[in-house]
């Protein structure tokens, strides 16, 4: 009887645990309780030399009048090799926020997809979208969960931006590998070419930029980053490959069409050719 009672108690505890996991508004928490092996982070790697993996490089973001913009180049590198010229590093997190990734590409893309599901799951369970602050905090917790792998060389550093209806303005958040979250008030950049992109934005960004002017500044800053950082790919005129750029306003997120970016790139090239500068 005692063993049967213990068995019932154990089964009861399992049922309670499963019900609690199923009712949580956090999909990541549910997964960590029911199938932790499916999470892209929080697992130790076996000892040995890490193989080379593709890395995403430069992301830029800035506020403008009525919203926020995020842009990323198209190159992924693996050591000294170009792993991809077509990679996309900026994604819509939901209808009113976007996410840019730098670092280990495979992990970063998995975390991005998990974050998208996390926001969708919360809205379905709670019946209302998570606030922008809440989204930023959830992303920070996910980055913190990847810390064991970051300490082994597989770091993911995101950039998060969205429109905050409570403040009627775009907001921008950066992170470190420990999940620390920092709000950036004007513009920011992450990745190997970030120091050059940030220098360009310091000169070109100004308060009250229009959306079209912000797109110009983003393209200029990625041009500068690619000029000095071999891991950042500039606009590719031969292959007609332009950066991926999203804007987020009160009306939601919008991906800038490639044909519009082609026109912007041509204007930037003409302007730089007219200056005739070496660097």
From Swiss-Prot:
Protease found in the keyword field:
yes
User: Where is this protein chiefly located?
Assistant: cytoplasm
Its domain of life reads Bacteria
Concerning InterPro entries, the annotation shows:
Ntn_hydrolases_N, Proteasome_sua/b, Proteasome_suB-type, PSB_actinobac
Query: One GO term of the cellular component aspect?
Result: proteasome core complex, beta-subunit complex
Which SUPFAM superfamilies does the UniProt entry name for this protein? N-terminal nucleophile aminohydrolases (Ntn hydrolases)
NCBIfam families on file: 20S_bact_beta
Would you tell me the protein name for this molecule?
Answer: Proteasome subunit beta
């Amino acid at each position: 009887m005692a063993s049967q009672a213990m068995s019932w108690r154990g089964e009861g505890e399992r049922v309670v645990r499963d019900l609690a996991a199923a009712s949580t508004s956090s999909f990541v928490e549910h997964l960590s309780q029911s199938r932790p092996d499916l999470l892209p982070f929080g697992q130790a790697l076996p000892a040995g030399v890490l193989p080379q993996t593709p890395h995403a490089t430069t992301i830029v973001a800035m506020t403008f009048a009525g919203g926020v913009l995020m842009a990323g180049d198209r190159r992924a590198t693996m050591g000294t090799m170009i792993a991809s010229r077509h990679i996309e590093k900026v994604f819509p997190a939901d209808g009113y926020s976007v996410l840019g990734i730098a670092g280990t590409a495979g992990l970063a893309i998995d975390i991005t997809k998990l974050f998208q599901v996390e926001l969708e799951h919360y809205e379905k369970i709670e019946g209302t979208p998570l606030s922008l602050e809440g989204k930023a905090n959830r992303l920070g917790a996910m980055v913190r969960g990847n810390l064991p792998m970051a300490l082994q060389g597989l770091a993911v550093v995101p950039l998060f931006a969205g429109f905050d209806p409570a403040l009627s303005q775009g907001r921008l958040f950066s992170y470190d590998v420990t999940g620390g979250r920092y709000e950036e008030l004007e513009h920011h950049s992450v990745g190997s070419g970030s120091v050059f992109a940030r220098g360009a934005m310091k000169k070109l960004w100004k308060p009250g930029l229009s959306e079209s002017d912000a797109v110009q500044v983003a393209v200029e800053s990625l041009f500068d980053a690619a000029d000095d950082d071999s891991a950042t790919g500039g606009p590719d005129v031969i292959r007609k490959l332009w950066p991926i750029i999203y804007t987020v306003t009160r009306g939601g997120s919008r991906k800038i069409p490639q044909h519009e970016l082609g026109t912007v790139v041509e204007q930037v090239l003409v302007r730089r050719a007219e200056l005739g500068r070496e660097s």
